[in-house]
């Protein structure tokens, strides 16, 4: 994260600063295909994908977007080959350790959401350290969904609310959307305005099911390691051409 891209460093003139999404979420798909197309092992695609994520984070910060959430590892991803899963866990840990100083310098506030207790202990420690060290930063809010599943999150919310009702701390008649929000992993974070999915797949893959209720969805055939500022520019331009009605006329 030490060299800023010179291309599109500032907001492109055809984008309206006042109509930018304040929160962008991204499903980073296509790392394996990118590597396969080049005769490389899948893990090389994941390594290049890290660079794309770092560049997107900096781009959001440069262009005035307040929050970025990335789908790094789903609850279903444990079903991938063991070698790939172990590599990803090591990669997450190594990147966190390497980039923490830079995130502090750039005022990034990082947060991890998901079932973090199932991750390797050493990775849990790095996650806890990064969140603790950046918790008072006031710049872009960077959320990383790790061992995350939207259905699992909703089950977690139901269990938490049930315990509160059972203990007499919560009246069932008072349960509304606001109560549910308090028990989400993403509590306190605004809902995404724009979801970007790379690689052309037309599904949301169990990502932020509650939070995506009114998000605009943009799908690009670009594979994640190739997703750059120009590709992000196209996504934002498409977003600004839409009229968000939130269920109204």
From Swiss-Prot:
Signal peptide extent: none
- Please cite one Gene Ontology biological process associated with this protein: polyprenol biosynthetic process
Catalytic residues of the enzyme: 29, 77 (proton acceptor)
- Kindly list the GO molecular function terms attached to this UniProt entry: magnesium ion binding; prenyltransferase activity
Which cofactor(s) are needed, names only? Mg(2+)
Give binding positions for Mg(2+).
Answer: 29, 216
Query: Partners and quaternary state?
Result: Homodimer.
Role, per record = Catalyzes the condensation of isopentenyl diphosphate (IPP) with allylic pyrophosphates generating different type of terpenoids.
Tell me what this protein is called.
Isoprenyl transferase
What organism is the protein native to?
Synechocystis sp. (strain ATCC 27184 / PCC 6803 / Kazusa)
